[in-house]
Amino acid sequence: MDSIFKDAEQKMKKALSSLKSELASLRAGRANPSILEGINVDYYGMATPLNQLANISAPEPRLLVVQPYDKSAIEDIEKAILKSDVGLTPNNDGQVIRLAVPQLTEERRNELVKIVRQKGEDTKVVVRNVRRDANDELKKLEKEKEISEDESIRGQDEIQKITDKYIKKIDEVMNAKEEEITSF
């Protein structure tokens, strides 16, 4: 039974971690290097992740600075940022690329809050599906007489506690991101 609990918790933890990384890439009006995650640069004919070609920092709340390790790649990096859907316009001075992060409009904030809620709800569905699968496994063990009915019920209660813990964590992550979006 312990393996069922561990497996369920592991899957729920993975779902929460996935939600956190998805939400980190949502632009909330302040400069965050994770905005540029997932951008690949055509570097000598190979698609290379931007963070392997440059140092990305946020020296000010509304400014990202991309400092290429190889200055000859600056044009390629600029093109990759323009082609991506981050919605930022690069300003290239030959040494570094500066990206000014504009203030979010009220409409865009509301749109982002909806996206956050949708991603959160999708993650809750994943967690609930994990709970269902774990409970089904416990019922199967009970049916095969490997565990008693009492053990099955205790196991389902334990699975519910784990589920509640992760649903609460998902809500906390969603609320923090919504706060970040609406407070700027």
Curated annotation (Swiss-Prot):
Q: Which GO terms describe its cellular component?
A: cytoplasm
Q: Does the keyword Ubl conjugation apply?
A: no
Kindly give the InterPro entries that the UniProt entry links to this protein: Ribosome_recyc_fac (IPR002661), Ribosome_recyc_fac_dom (IPR023584), RRF_sf (IPR036191)
Q: Where in the cell is it found?
A: Cytoplasm
The alphabetical list of record keywords is: Cytoplasm, Protein biosynthesis
Q: Which GO terms describe its biological process?
A: translational termination
Membrane spanning residue stretches: none
One of the record's GO molecular function terms: ribosomal large subunit binding
Q: Which Pfam families match?
A: RRF (PF01765)
**UniProt keyword annotation of Ribonucleoprotein present:** no
Q: Which NCBIfam families match?
A: frr (TIGR00496)
Q: Which PANTHER family does its entry note?
A: MITOCHONDRIAL RIBOSOME RECYCLING FACTOR PSEUDO 1, RIBOSOME RECYCLING FACTOR
Family indicated by similarity: Belongs to the RRF family.
Primary role: Responsible for the release of ribosomes from messenger RNA at the termination of protein biosynthesis. May increase the efficiency of translation by recycling ribosomes from one round of translation to another.
Q: What's the protein name?
A: Ribosome-recycling factor
Q: Which organism is it from?
A: Natranaerobius thermophilus (strain ATCC BAA-1301 / DSM 18059 / JW/NM-WN-LF)
